[in-house]
Every structure is written in C-alpha cells, then in structure tokens.
Amino acid sequence: MQLLVGLLLAAVAARAHYTFPRLVVNGQPEDKDWSVTRMTKNAQSKQGVQDPTSPDIRCYTSQTAPNVATVPAGATVHYISTQQINHPGPTQYYLAKVPAGSSAKTWDGSGAVWFKISTTMPYLDNNKQLVWPNQNTYTTVNTTIPADTPSGEYLLRVEQIALHLASQPNGAQFYLACSQIQITGGGNGTPGPLVALPGAYKSNDPGILVNIYSMQPGDYKPPGPPVWSG
C-alpha cells in the first residue's frame, strides 16, 4: 500500500513539473525533442534545479544534442513544454557565444560568457492574483534574438523560475534548457554584461528568495544581470 501511495505521489509530482525539449524558431519547431536542445537530467523526473549555485544551473544537461538550429538575428523564439507551465515565476533567456575553435555541439558554456536578452515581470489578473506571462500554457513566452547580436554559434538558454515555494531557502525551482544555435545575419553589437553560470545567482538574491504572495508586481527584481536588448 505504501509503495502504491509513493508511486501515485511521484506521478502527481511529475505532472506538476516540466521540461523544455523543443525549440521553436519563427513558428517552426525543431524536428523532434532534444534535436538541437540538449537533453536535461530531469527529462524523466521533470524536477527543477533548486540550488542556483550548482553547476546544473547552467544547462542541467545529461548530454549534448546532435544538431544545430539556424536562427536569423531578429528571429522570435520560444520553447514547447512537456506539461503546463503552472508555477508562477519569470521566464528569462540568455545567450553565450561559442569561442573560436569550439563547436556548439560540444562546448560546455563555462566562464563569464552569458548575457541576458529578456525577462518577464508579473501582473495582476482579474482576480487580483499575481501571475506571469504564459503561466498555465504549454509554451514559454516568446523572445526576440536582438538584431545587433553578432553572427556565429551560440548556446541559447531558457529558464522559468517557479516561485510558489520561494519564501524558504532553496525553495525556488529552476526549469531550464540550452539549445545549440547558429545566428545568421547578425550585427555588430557588443553584448553584455557577461556573467558565469553558476556565479550569476546567489540563493538569497531577492528574485530567488522571495514571498510572491505579499508583493506588488513592480516589486519583483529578476535575478541575474540586466537585459541586453542590442
């Protein structure tokens, strides 16, 4: 009986969590799950990362992906989720340029190489509840690759930070993925500031250790560097 209860609880927990296995570029999804997006360690369990200082906060990967997606500068991108994104919290996107002599198919994204290209802020719904864009949908919010991003190979990283339990230490849950992309038709911008993952976040950052049930929408402070919009 206890085993059955445990299995049922595990199944419920899995349905409450999610992964982002498929990148969509200008409305066109990658051919199949984990084709250009690196398979994450939680591909089966769907559990998020809870220690923002651990190496898993970078890409949470168990392996690299076999392919690289072509993404024009200025393109709109988002991810398909395996389950409904039902937890409240921001969605943020980062890019990291692959160094010369390395490949998007093998590079690990280490060092101060990541820059943020977008984040989302909460708002009050008709019931005066704090919600985030694309909450309770099956896709992450759209973002645009800045037109001034230099051409080349990159890792594209998405994270959705679930904050429903974030009033306690390490209660925030990070659901994330990294995709291997080739940006074409880029510009001459200088993206920044550049940060390392791990390194950009602390467990007690105000956007990570936070009680979202006692705040107004404008009070929230997303973790990490400011957005580079090109």
Curated annotation (Swiss-Prot):
Gene Ontology CC: extracellular region
Required cofactor names: Cu(2+)
EC number(s) reported in the record: 1.14.99.56
Keyword line: Carbohydrate metabolism, Cellulose degradation, Copper, Disulfide bond, Glycoprotein, Metal-binding, Monooxygenase, Oxidoreductase, Polysaccharide degradation, Secreted, Signal
Organism ancestry: Eukaryota, Fungi, Dikarya, Ascomycota, Pezizomycotina
Location relative to the cell: Secreted
Keyword Signal included in the entry's annotation: yes
Top-rank taxon, per record: Eukaryota
Listed name of the protein: AA9 family lytic polysaccharide monooxygenase T
Details of cofactor binding: Binds 1 copper ion per subunit.
Biotech applications: Lignocellulose is the most abundant polymeric composite on Earth and is a recalcitrant but promising renewable substrate for industrial biotechnology applications. Together with cellobiose dehydrogenases (CDHs) an enzymatic system capable of oxidative cellulose cleavage is formed, which increases the efficiency of cellulases and put LPMOs at focus of biofuel research.
Family (UniProt): Belongs to the polysaccharide monooxygenase AA9 family.
